[in-house]
Amino acid sequence: MELGLSPLHLSSSPEDLYLASGTPPGTPPPLDAPLSGEVKRSQPLPIPTSRKLLREEELQSTSLPSIPNPFPELCSPSSQSPILGGSSSARGLLPRDTSCPHVIKVYSEDGTCRSVEVATGATARYVCEMLVQRSHALSDENWGLVECHPYLALERALEDHESVAEVQAAWPIGGDSRIVFRKNFAKYELFKSTPHSLFPEKMVSSCLDAHTGMSHEDVIQNFLNAGSFPEIQGFLQLRGSGRKLWKRFFCFLRRSGLYYSTKGTSKDPRHLQYVADVNESNVYVVTQGRKLYGMPTDFGFCIKPNKLRNGHKGLRLFCTEDERSRSCWLAAFRLFKFGVQLYKNYQQTLCRHMCPPCGGSPPSRSVSDDTLVAMDFSGHAGRVIENPREALSAALEEAQAWRKKTNHRLSLPTPSSGTSLSAAIHRTQPWFHGRISREESQRLIRQQGLVDGLFLVRESQRNPQGFVLSLCHVQKVKHYLILPSEEEGRLYFSMDDGLTRFTDLLQLVEFHQLNRGILPCLLRYCCTRVAL
């Protein structure tokens, strides 16, 4: 028995597979349909255009009630969506409008923090001035912001013109990075130091001196004024990528980047290996180099590319033999990257803090230790003391006069109360840090800049009744013991076995701010901490 199959199911024609528009399913074919034996030819089908479909959808949507879109940022264009956008500002890391407020959290050295609302383009100098006013601190050019990454043990002082919001935008999300508000006495020390102390002759390439006929001092002065960029060279210990071994190489810092020679001190391009780009990176100080990175010395620094957000991979680690070499390399990196802008920041700082309020020209030269002279005011007119022995004798006489004045002050009707008040007056001073360790005092001074004359006073851990004066000189921290002594019922303090005695620590500090005494330099800057 044969079963008859309908030609509709056996045909391979496209017309049989696709029903005509408007024909319901199950409708038999028309009477004028060709037989199965005839050759069927394809016919054009009506395909609705996209515009027609959009119009039909609009008509259907207008007939339905409007439902609010719960995710408008997903439906907005990529240039306006904070999720679909490609830039950092579009991803929500920074507000798109520079005039919009931006909240930053700033920490102090004692661990306290404070949230400050500033404009998105606020610079580090503007934020510092705001924090100085709110903390009622003494305004000077030494305040600064420091970018800290505790996980990586990296620190970097922000320049005055840098935007704080842009710096925070490059941080990893959910990390422990922070901004710290503290003193930075070494920020512009490169413009105050002599050329030989900043960059020794062995660190500056001699080819530029021979080509221009300029002296070493002129080359460094042009370098500081961003007039020229000499080649900085010297030995550095660096660690290879993914390796734990440190090797000593001769490195060159140029405008094009940092290089090291694979063959001694050769400058042949065949022997130079590219390390990092200065303009696309930031240089940081490594605080725990031995513990975290296995550095052979404590004087390490790191070059971190701007595109690197987190992790140790991609960091270029270096270390020097001493603190002076590290300071020279850090200063060279800053000058190569920021150039004339760094010098402008320094000039603006001088105009802000040295010009008188009524206006006028700044002083022709800054007051330093070299411009201070000993004076004799015993007669009717002042006289400059040129003899060093006579100057030392005048300093000792001044110390004796201070002691007599203090003895007269203490000879009041209540000497016991006056003595106790004089003995505890140092606790109200910003340079007194209480009972901190020797290592902590060195860390505080190192963080605020290893400049000559930076000091603090702390309680001695070995001698319960004594104190210690920690002083920075030639980028090294030295400690001087202050011992108390009692004579005729009165308490005195001395650092030279009683040769020069003071009734309290405040008198001792004020005396050595004007006279060196047994110290290698004057007490110029006090290491202080401010709570926000």
Curated annotation (Swiss-Prot):
Comp. bias (Low complexity): 1-24, 76-89
Bilayer topology annotation: Peripheral membrane protein
Residues in Ras-associating domain copies: 100-186
Modified residues (Phosphotyrosine): 188
Post-translational modification: Phosphorylated on serine and threonine residues in response to activation of receptor kinases. Phosphorylated on tyrosine residues by TEK/TIE2. Phosphorylated on tyrosine residues by PTK2/FAK1, and possibly also other kinases. Phosphorylation is enhanced by activation of receptor kinases by a cognate ligand. Tyrosine phosphorylation is essential for activation of down-stream protein kinases. Phosphorylation decreases affinity for target mRNA molecules.
Subcellular location(s) per record: Cytoplasm; Cell projection; Cell junction, Focal adhesion; Cell membrane
Residue numbers carrying Phosphoserine: 361
Site, Important for lipid binding and for stimulation of cell migration: residue positions: 239
Record-marked site positions (Important for dimerization and for HRAS activation): 511
PROSITE patterns hit by this protein: PH_DOMAIN, RA, SH2
An example Gene Ontology molecular-function term: RNA binding
Subunit structure: Homodimer. Interacts (via SH2 domain) with EGFR, ERBB2, ERBB3 (when phosphorylated), ERBB4 (when phosphorylated), EPHB1, INSR, FGFR1, PDGFRA (tyrosine phosphorylated) and PDGFRB (tyrosine phosphorylated). Interacts (via SH2 domain) with TEK/TIE2 (tyrosine phosphorylated). Interacts with SHC1. Interacts with RND1. Interacts (when tyrosine phosphorylated) with FHL2 and HAX1. Interacts (via SH2 domain) with RET and PTK2/FAK1. Interacts (when not phosphorylated) with ELAVL1.
Family assignment from sequence similarity: Belongs to the GRB7/10/14 family.
Protein name: Growth factor receptor-bound protein 7
Species name: Bos taurus
